[in-house]
Design a protein with these regions (language model features):
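Structural detector for short beta-strands of small beta-barrel domains
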Residues: 1-16, 48, 55
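Short aromatic-glycine-enriched beta-strand elements
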Residues: 14-24
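Domain-length accessory/inserted modules outside core catalytic folds
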Residues: 21-23, 41, 47, 70, ...
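Short, surface-exposed secondary-structure junctions/capping segments
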Residues: 22, 49-60
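Acidic/polar residues in short coil/turn loops that connect beta-strands
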Residues: 26-28
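A short macromolecule-binding patch
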Residues: 30-35
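Short nucleic-acid-contacting surface segments enriched for D/E, G, S/T with interspersed K/R
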Residues: 38-54
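OB-fold/S1-family single-stranded nucleic acid-binding modules
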Residues: 58-75
Length: 75
């Protein structure tokens, strides 16, 4: 498990402009896509706020992805 700190940002939208994917943008300009759908709504309520998320990180050819196990607002 790894913890990352950053800001919750939108990462993709549907054809109507609705946010369908979130990411965490870190201080070192990395972006981690949020994989965990169950947490999507809760993290969406923290859009543009600083958080700490803990979970499993994996890398694809194009993206870093985190499966979030827990999160909290950054103090």
């Amino acid at each position: 498990m790894a913890s990352i700190k950053g800001i919750v940002i939108p990462a993709a939208w549907d054809q109507n402009g609705k946010i369908i994917t979130l990411a965490i943008a870190t201080d070192d300009e990395q972006e981690y896509l949020i994989e965990t759908r169950q947490i999507f709504t809760k993290l969406k309520s923290l859009l543009r706020e600083e958080v700490v998320v803990t979970g499993t990180i994996r890398q694809t050819e194009k993206n870093k992805i985190i499966e979030v196990k827990s999160y909290s607002r950054r103090q």
